[in-house]
């Protein structure tokens, strides 16, 4: 449910459109390449690549607040948005065709004001003494500045990349820039899988901040570590860094 969407990563998936049967884990959207290439990264220094929604920011709580203003509610019976957002007056689900506009409205209204996940800023601040940090989020490109401002206001001032689609290709390109240990945190299993296929050495952390979502999904099969708490994610990263001499 990360990246302000259900377990997909694009507006089309939110709308109910099916992703391609076998998406390329190495694919990278053309809008992402210049964002990565513009980053100032130090070769030989470890890199932490973190998702935003349900990892750094409380997406679900923010979405529920927004839905309330629209006369809607989230019937959280599965790890998805399409089919689970219902009208309060009729209890009918919002049709898939209306989901893109609904989510666009949410982005415009709420991207800048989502609450931070407890412990995220403190953990990344400590880890930044030993590693570089980049936020890789499937937020619409036009909302990138708002996302950066929101994270910065919460004490998370690191560069933001507005991704589109799976994240394997982006992480692989980032890893090639640093040639050092890479850690990837995300709540979406198929994002973790795409990174596992695109850059096998990456340490994969399945992080879901909201306990309701965590109970619905369970650990991703390709993750090396699963948690809902930043203190535990920090310990895992610190131990791996120490084991690799950093």
Where are these regions (language model features)?
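Short acidic-hydrophobic, aromatic-tinged amphipathic segments that line or gate anion-handling sites
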Residues: 159-165, 223-233
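Active-site neighborhood of HAD-like aspartate-dependent phosphohydrolases
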Residues: 15-98
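Short glycine- and acidic-rich boundary segments immediately preceding or forming the N-terminal edge
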Residues: 1-28, 231, 235
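Short, basic/glycine-rich phosphate-binding loops at helix/coil junctions
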Residues: 90-107, 147-153
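Substrate-recognition "cap/lid" segment bordering the active-site pocket of phosphatases
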Residues: 140-183, 190-196
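Short, acidic loop-to-helix structural element flanking the phosphoryl-transfer center
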Residues: 95-96, 108-134, 141-148
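Acidic, Mg2+-coordinating phosphoryl-transfer loop and its flanking beta/alpha structural elements
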Residues: 184-228
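Glycine-rich phosphate-binding loop signature in dinucleotide/nucleotide-binding domains
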Residues: 42-43, 130, 176-181
């Amino acid at each position: 449910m990360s990246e302000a969407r259900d377990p997909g990563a694009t507006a089309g998936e939110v709308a109910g459109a099916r992703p391609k049967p076998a998406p390329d884990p190495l694919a990278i959207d053309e809008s992402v390449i210049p964002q990565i290439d513009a980053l100032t990264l130090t070769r030989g220094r470890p890199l932490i690549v973190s998702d935003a929604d349900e990892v750094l920011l409380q997406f679900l709580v923010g979405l529920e607040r927004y839905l309330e203003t629209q006369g809607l509610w989230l019937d959280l019976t599965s790890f998805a948005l399409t089919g689970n957002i219902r009208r309060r007056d009729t209890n009918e689900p919002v049709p898939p065709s209306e989901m893109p506009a609904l989510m666009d409205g949410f982005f415009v209204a709420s991207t800048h004001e989502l609450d931070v996940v407890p412990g995220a800023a403190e953990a990344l601040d400590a880890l930044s003494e030993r590693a570089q940090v980049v936020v890789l989020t499937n937020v619409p490109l036009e909302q990138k500045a708002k996302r950066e401002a929101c994270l910065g206001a919460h004490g998370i001032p690191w560069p933001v990349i507005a991704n589109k689609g799976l994240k394997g290709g982006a992480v692989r390109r980032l890893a090639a820039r640093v040639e050092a240990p890479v850690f990837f945190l995300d709540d979406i299993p198929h994002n973790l899988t795409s990174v596992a296929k695109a850059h096998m050495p990456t340490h994969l952390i399945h992080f879901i901040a909201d306990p309701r979502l965590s109970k619905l999904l369970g650990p991703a099969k390709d993750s090396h570590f699963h948690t809902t708490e930043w203190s535990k994610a920090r310990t895992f990263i610190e131990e791996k860094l120490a084991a690799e001499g950093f």
